[in-house]
Structure formats: C-alpha cells, structure tokens
Amino acid sequence: MKALVKKTDHELIQLFTDGNLEALEALVIRHKDKLYTSILFLVKDKYLAEDIFQDVFIRIIDTMRSGRYTEEGKFLPWAMRIAHNLCVDHFRKVKRTPTIRNSEDKDIFEVLNFTDDSAETVMMKRQSHHRVREMLERLPEDQREVIILRHYADMSFKEIAAATDCSINTALGRMRYGLINLRKLMVQKQIAL
C-alpha cells in the first residue's frame, strides 16, 4: 500500500482496472476529504453525505471497470462533478433546490485537522470558523458554493468551473463578489479574523 501512495491518479486507475483493489483504496484515501467535505456542504446531512459519497465511488468503479474513463490526469475534477451531479439529483428527487450549508450535527470544520494546539487556540479557531460559517450562510448560493469549493475543497477555478457547469471567468467573478460581500459582513459585524 505504501508504494501505491506515490503513484499518480492515472497509475492507480490503471492498476485498479488491471485488478488491483488496493489501488482503488489508495484513490479513495487520497480524495475522500475533499469529496466528502464538498458533498457535506451541499447536502447539510452527514448520513446523506456518506450515502452520496459511496454512490460517487460506485459510479467511479462502474465507469472504470467498463473502460469508459478517459479523463487522464483529471480524476478529482471528474469525481467532484459526479458528486455535484448526485447532490443535484438528490435535491431534484425531493423537489428542493440545492443549497450549500454546513451540517448542524457535525461541524464541517471538524473535518479540517487541527494541529496539537492548546485548548484555548482550538476554541478560538472554532469561534472564528463559526463566525465565517454564519457569514457564508448569508451569501448568495452561487458565491457561497465557489468559496466553499475553493477554500475547503481546495479546488482550482478550472475544477470549480467544471463542477458547477460554468465558465472559469464566472467562477472567478463569483469568488470575487463573494469575498467582497464577506468583507462587508465582517465590517458590519466588526469582526476581525
């Protein structure tokens, strides 16, 4: 397994299609945090996020086994697009529009690992994250989605554009206006982060 960690996504996919199940496990481990975090922000329910996360990898496995995977070097954006589409499908089924929110029962910022900080530092970080989360909720959905995908899922603007089905310039514009609006909210609330 240690040898697989150093392989590229493309190499892992090739190994998996040749029958190496550990290669798939390495892919899951490599990308699970970004995928799960993005899904959780979209659906706001940790159990639903886990279900969708599993569905994403079921689709990935089916596609790779059938030989239809062709996006060399673009595994994560492709997987994020599948996750986004499955979230949209879920909301269509329940006749709701997709929203991006954090989970009430599991703080999404808990997914981000803190270093061995003191209890006071951890508490201050949690308070800051809570304030940012409250301000993110006040942003328009399209701006909130781009900020979340950029900062918490660590996606490039090209990947964000592919995942949200918009142009790179549109994603950049949403990010710009989202950050401007966040700054305005910080000034209004007199918050320094």
Residue ranges and their predicted role:
Residues S66, R81-N102:
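Arg/Lys-rich amphipathic alpha helix in sigma70-family domain 2
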Residues A3, T17-E25, Y36-D55, I168, ...:
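Short, charged helix-capping/linker segments at alpha-helix termini
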Residues M1-Q14:
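Extreme N-terminal regulatory/targeting segments of RNA polymerase sigma factors
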Residues T17-D18, F57-K74:
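Sigma70-family region 2
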Residues V88, R131-V132, Q143, L149-Y152, ...:
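DNA-recognition helix of helix-turn-helix
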Residues V28-Y47, T63, L136, N181, ...:
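Amphipathic, Lys/Arg- and hydrophobic-enriched alpha-helical face
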Residues Q14, D18-L21, K95, F109, ...:
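Amphipathic alpha-helical segment used for protein-protein interaction
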Residues D51-I58, G73-N85:
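Structural recognition of an alpha-helix C-terminal capping motif at a helix-to-coil junction
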